[in-house]
């Protein structure tokens, strides 16, 4: 029996489904987390062979001892994953220390975590990216901004999501940024005029896709976080060929094997000198894990399938026979607490209840980017989806 160590299997809350499908495939699933065992979902507890509680997952020594304990008790660990951006570097360090060769090692982390290092691999894939500057002095940053023109975007070179990400529109805003920024390495990029689209896939051991999908985010996540806007994004009914092509070239260039990926691109909404023409695909950043929150469930709703099983099949068998059913648009809307929406919950359910797949409160840890109350709805046409979004975000 193969041993799979799952780091923080309780977060996000839907990740118990990954553990359940691993168990169904004959894997011994060993959990490590800082949530008390009795507070784990019953479905998660029944999926785990054993759970090792640490006082804090932030304490590397504690987590190391947990993996060492499982190694002593059950033998060599075959897989170790969290499927969580926050722990990717921790996962890689543990794999390296325990000689677990089924995933990224510490030496791989620079190219998959640092936005500046990603640029060379996008170039290798033949995909253009925004010009950039690693922030050091105010004068050098000012010269870069003058070269590419305001606005510019600044964000941590190694960061999660849209945290600490800003659009700067003038020298004065740049000066304020330097006076108030955190003591981390920032990257500054020219502003790309485009809509974010993604290539989301489960990749096998030879770089082959076992499942492919994608989503579109009409609004900037940076703006959603910084301005507390509603969060909207949707799973595409059919993955455009140009996005699929860019995704697979990126997978090959980055050497991705045996994992879930969420690769972000821009589709240009206007011609942009040095980048391309309207409609061209531009590299944004790679995320070597599933798209966040409840997006895995949205793939299932959109394609009448089960990505938790497909992923677990990839781990256990390096293939999957799980079928894809009818295809739909699956539209997420995250509303904000306290805002006066024209349609209250009852009106929303009366109008869209037939296609509503999920609704409920979003965990506070995700609410900055995803809103406070989520509605996830299947729709069959783009026109129906656009009407749904108009109704969902309209205020009184």
Language model features: what each stretch is:
Residues 1-105, 319, 382-395:
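ATP-binding N-terminal substructure of ATP-dependent carboxylate-amine bond-forming enzymes
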Residues 51-58, 133-137, 166-169:
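Short acidic-hydrophobic, aromatic-tinged amphipathic segments that line or gate anion-handling sites
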Residues 62, 140-141, 173:
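Short acidic active-site motifs
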Residues 70-77, 147-148, 181-183:
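Glycine-rich phosphate-binding loop signature in dinucleotide/nucleotide-binding domains
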Residues 95-164:
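A conserved helix-loop-beta module that forms one wall/lid of the active-site cleft
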Residues 128-130, 151-154, 163-198, 220-231, ...:
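Conserved ATP-binding module of the ATP-grasp superfamily
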Residues 190-256, 260, 267-271, 275-278, ...:
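ATP-dependent carboxylate/phosphate-activation module, predominantly the ATP-grasp catalytic core
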Residues 310-396:
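Peripheral (often C-terminal) accessory segments that flank ATP-dependent C-N-forming ligase machineries
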């Amino acid at each position: 029996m193969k041993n799979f160590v799952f780091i923080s299997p309780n977060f996000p809350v839907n990740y118990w489904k990954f553990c359940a499908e691993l168990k169904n495939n004959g894997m011994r699933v060993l959990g490590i987390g800082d949530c008390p065992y009795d507070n784990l979902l019953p479905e998660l507890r029944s999926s785990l062979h054993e759970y090792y509680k640490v006082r804090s997952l932030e304490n590397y020594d504690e987590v190391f001892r947990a993996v060492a304990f499982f190694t002593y008790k059950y033998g060599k660990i075959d897989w170790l994953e969290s499927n969580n951006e926050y722990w990717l570097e921790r996962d890689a360090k543990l794999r390296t220390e325990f000689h677990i060769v089924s995933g990224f090692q510490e030496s791989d982390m620079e190219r998959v975590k640092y936005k500046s290092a990603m640029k060379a691999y996008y170039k290798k894939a033949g995909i253009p990216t925004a010009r950039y500057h690693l922030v050091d002095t105010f004068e050098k940053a000012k010269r870069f901004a003058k070269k590419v023109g305001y606005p510019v975007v600044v964000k941590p070179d190694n960061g999660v999501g849209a945290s600490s990400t800003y659009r700067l529109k003038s020298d004065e805003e740049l000066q304020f940024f330097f006076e108030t920024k955190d003591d981390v390495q920032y990257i500054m990029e020219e502003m790309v005029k485009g809509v974010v689209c993604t290539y989301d896939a489960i990749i096998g051991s030879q770089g082959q896709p076992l499942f492919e999908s994608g989503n579109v985010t009409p609004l900037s996540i940076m703006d959603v976080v910084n301005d507390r806007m509603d969060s909207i994004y949707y799973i595409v009914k059919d993955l455009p060929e140009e996005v699929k092509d860019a995704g697979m070239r990126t997978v090959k260039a980055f050497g991705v094997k045996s994992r879930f990926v969420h690769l972000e691109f821009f589709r240009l909404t206007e011609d942009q000198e040095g980048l391309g023409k309207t409609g061209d695909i531009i590299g944004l950043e790679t995320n070597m894990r599933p798209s966040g929150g409840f997006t895995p469930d949205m793939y299932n709703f959109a394609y009448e399938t089960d990505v938790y099983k497909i992923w677990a099949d990839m781990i256990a068998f390096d293939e999957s026979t799980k079928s894809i059913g009818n295809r739909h648009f699956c539209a997420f809307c995250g509303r904000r607490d306290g805002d006066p929406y024209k349609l209250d919950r009852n009106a929303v359910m009366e109008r869209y209840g037939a296609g509503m797949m999920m609704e409920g409160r979003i965990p506070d840890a995700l609410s900055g980017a995803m809103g406070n109350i989520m509605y996830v709805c299947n729709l069959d046409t783009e026109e129906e989806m656009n009407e749904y979004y108009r109704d969902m975000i309209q205020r009184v």
